[in-house]
Amino acid sequence: MGWLFYTDRRIKSYADEKAEITRLCTFEGDTRKTELVKACKVASTWYAAARVTNLDGTAVEDTTYVTDADGSITFGAVFLTRYDDGSWGYKDMEESAGPVESRAPLSLLALLSELKDPDSYAHAWRQRCQDWAAIPDYEEGDKIRLAAPVTLTDGSTCQIVTATHYKRGRQKRRCYRIEETGGLVRLSKASLADSELLSSAKGAASPVLAEYLAGRN
């Protein structure tokens, strides 16, 4: 399915978007109904968990999902969204289609029914979400070794950096100080995958933690 835009511009806010995602995930047919369990927005993408139940109370049988104890199944859905000239639009995909966007929170993944096929697109999508969630959020002063050198716009590279910040107006923005040059660089979360904590700012104030980290290096 392609993009669908609401040219009446009735979607204007986060609350409007969430209400529309809820509506899109809530419907009833002749034999089944679907209802939203949880929705989370990450950047411009909405992730949803939707539960399917049979109207007659019997267990839902599905080729992709293991039926839950209450007879329902809960699947994941992804809604790409954007605004075009003031009009909000979306493109939706069910997890079994293997969406590229894979940053669903672990709290949402925990609501989904088990999958029958461990080699399915849905299983691979869930694993990508888990891998993303596993990337650490470093704290101010943490010294880090990236899994691979990052090439900067001037052609130089960096691999050992320290988490710090810079200010833009009243806001603090995360950046990293390069070990070799002292320069500052902004890094995407993806570039921190498989990185290693060399020393922690907390370790300086905690002899026990400092000893633990020293033993790892």
Map each language-model feature to its residues:
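Charged, amphipathic alpha-helical stretches
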Residues: 1-31
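Short amphipathic alpha-helical segments that mediate assembly, nucleic-acid/protein binding
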Residues: 14-18, 32-36, 59, 73, ...
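Amphipathic, interaction-prone secondary-structure segments
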Residues: 23-82, 150-167
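Short glycine-rich, low-complexity/disordered patches
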Residues: 31-45, 122-125, 131, 141-145
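Short beta-strand micro-motifs in enzyme catalytic cores
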Residues: 46-48, 142, 172-176
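Intrinsically disordered, low-complexity, charged/polar segments
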Residues: 86-133, 175-217
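Short coil-to-beta transition motif at edge beta-strands of beta-rich domains
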Residues: 136-150
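Basic/aromatic-rich interaction segments and small domains that mediate binding to polyanionic partners
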Residues: 153-190
